[in-house]
Amino acid sequence: MAFISFPPRHPSSSARLPLTLIALDDWALSTITGVDSEKYIQGQVTADVSQMTEQQHLLAAHCDAKGKMWSTLRLFRERDGFAWIERRSVLEAQLTELKKYAVFSKVVIAPDDERVLLGVAGFQARAALANVFSVLPNSENQVVRDGASTLLWFEHPAERFLLVTDVATANMLTEKLHGEAELNNSQQWLALDIEAGIPVIDAANSGQFIPQATNLQALGGISFKKGCYTGQEMVARAKFRGANKRALWLLAGKASRVPEAGEDLELQMGENWRRTGAILAATQLDDGQLLVQAVMNNDLEAESVFRVRDDANTLHIVPLPYSLEE
């Protein structure tokens, strides 16, 4: 019996989100197993996975030789290897790149479509899950396991949980929360990631940006002390030579349409508008507000005014829940 996804509804902001169970169809799970798995993944991503405990998950980038990101990966340990979650639109291309050198190592890299990805967020999310699972993650233990389920804890923009589980547990959870929780699709989790300033790399932006252009250093996703990995030289140069002039920004406001990933924005310059930046993700909330995650110059004025191209409405900068000060 397959897991049936949930119909879409406009997402809510974290501040006014009721208890919500979210089907994460736009994200995908993959694994690497085998005796060489840690050594192999360590040589491919920006974070130092050798320092990761069983109770941690972290965001890392998988880059090309020029330091441009194929994708960002939400990594955690699993059995004799690692699992990671990324946007489904980049899955195939990212796995192809990751497997390029696998023939020389004792590893198996594969997508995992057997398991289900769910988000639980909103009002009293912890209390709702405590009725179902015997243990829940928190700031100290960000990853816990309960039977067939792995639960990941997220602090921002408000406490929320990501579940990696089997079909039976997913259906059981849906049934238990029926009537108590709203059901929504990936757009709700996307809205929360945008609010949290977690970079969303879809196919349109794969291979376009170095990690620092999406604030990955501020999210603990880059180690400048670990050994070699693909793209390391360019990532290090951006830090030590100050070569990175871009950052990830959160914008909010109104627009007559929801722009696509890869589109640019327009910045108000006196009476005129100038094209700028690249949109990573955007979504419209249930109150009509548009949230936009974009990579733009890192020296923008806080009161800068933007718009979706040729739109009559405007967008403004919203502070992120973390600092970019090094």
Swiss-Prot record:
Which UniProt keywords are present, listed alphabetically? Cytoplasm, Folate-binding, tRNA processing
Question: Is the keyword tRNA processing in the record?
Answer: yes
One GO term in the molecular function aspect is: folic acid binding
GO cellular component labels: cytoplasm
List cystine links.
none
Q: What is its main location?
A: cytoplasm
Where on this chain does folate bind? Answer: W27, W189
Provide one Gene Ontology biological process annotation. RNA modification
InterPro entries reported for this sequence: GcvT/YgfZ_C, tRNA-modifying_YgfZ, YgfZ/GcvT, YgfZ/GcvT_CS, YgfZ_barrel
The family database entries (Gene3D superfamilies) matched by this protein are listed as: 2.40.30.160, 3.30.70.1630, Aminomethyltransferase beta-barrel domains
Keyword tRNA processing assigned to the entry: answer is yes
- Which purpose does this protein serve, as stated in its record? Folate-binding protein involved in regulating the level of ATP-DnaA and in the modification of some tRNAs. It is probably a key factor in regulatory networks that act via tRNA modification, such as initiation of chromosomal replication.
The UniProt family comment states: Belongs to the tRNA-modifying YgfZ family.
Q: What is this protein called?
A: tRNA-modifying protein YgfZ
